[in-house]
Amino acid sequence: MSYFDKLPKGVKIRSFFVSSAGFFLDGYDLSVISFAIYFIEHEMGLSSVETGLVTASSLIGMIFGAILFGWLSDKVGRSRIMGIDLIFFAVFGITSALSQNFIQLFISRLLLGVGIGGDYPVSSTLIAEFSPSISRWRYLTGSVSMYWVGTLVSALITLLTLPLGAYYWRWVFLFGALISIPIILIRIRLIESPRWLVSKGVLKDSNLPKQEDENKGIKGYLDLFKGNVLLVTLFVSLVWFLFDVASYGIGLYYPLILREFAFPSNYEVLYGTMVIGIGAIIGYIIAEFLIDSLGRRVVLLFGLGAMSLLLILGGIVKIFGFILVPYFMTFVALEQWAGAVTLFYPTELFPTSVRSSGQGFATSISRIGAVLGVFYFPIMVKDLGFSTSLIVFGITCVIAFIFSILMAKETKRKTLEETSVGLKRS
């Protein structure tokens, strides 16, 4: 048992809570647009291109936020950045609610995305560094499952505010901004990660790992693209990119898919979307108990394999109607197995000195995939049809599955010193 495994339980729970709260807000703010865009499009008279840009704007912002805040987290510390990124949630959530035209809304959602993107590497790195090695994945999976709780809450708030009329979406955006404020106040009181302090030579003790054991010979950002670390960077970025093409390409359109191919009523669409979200939470609960026993590699391969099979079969049989709800509920449940591993693999494979930077880079690349999926899905549905589009996304999952077979490393029940990769082969 390492020194970090012996940290007080209260510290671990506090870090888990503040990280989970970040993922909750991520899920809320990213998901809320998927239903609201239908009303925004009509209110502002958006063109199809403008509608696509508004829908994808937060994902575009995440590309830049993940790299920036991931790098800053390695430079100045995890705790200092955790409060700053949520300021973006509060400020630009409010400006989104007050937007009067396409430009204002696009810029507001883009800058909101910068904060969301920044929270991914910082929150995931922090929870990984505070969690005990024997049950690290339960902490990690439990925290990211809050993303789908945020998604469910966004649907619930939409349901409650929908009677207000076409302007309801402004209140939904405002709610997301307001709930971020108390979380900011809690985060600014969080202690710094001991691992980060060791990596900087600030914290030294005979019971602690040596500074060189934490850093593995890596000194800066560019070392992510050298030697053995380059292979890790390529693996986590490429697989996550391919996963997000399908995950976000379909996921942000669940309400629109249900409206187009299943239900005519807005309320039926909302209920269907909430059922799908419950499926995701069930998937995370199952994954939480399996990943530390079966291992990351097995769960990742099973998740990607199930996604591939379901998407391709769904396209072949041309699935439609109310059956889409249990179909997508099953899909997202198994999708979370792969999703949890792709999200947290970088935190175990990169050493402390560039853990947040590596996570930020991988997040950024994954969001490029998400933007491509979100942008091209409606185009593919129009030109190729819904069923063929499912098959195309299924193929991206097959490619991710193949790369994972070749490159996925098992890290279960090992300390971060054991799982992280340095410039030289250990």
Segment roles from a protein language model:
Residues 1-426:
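Transmembrane-helix signature of 12-pass secondary carriers
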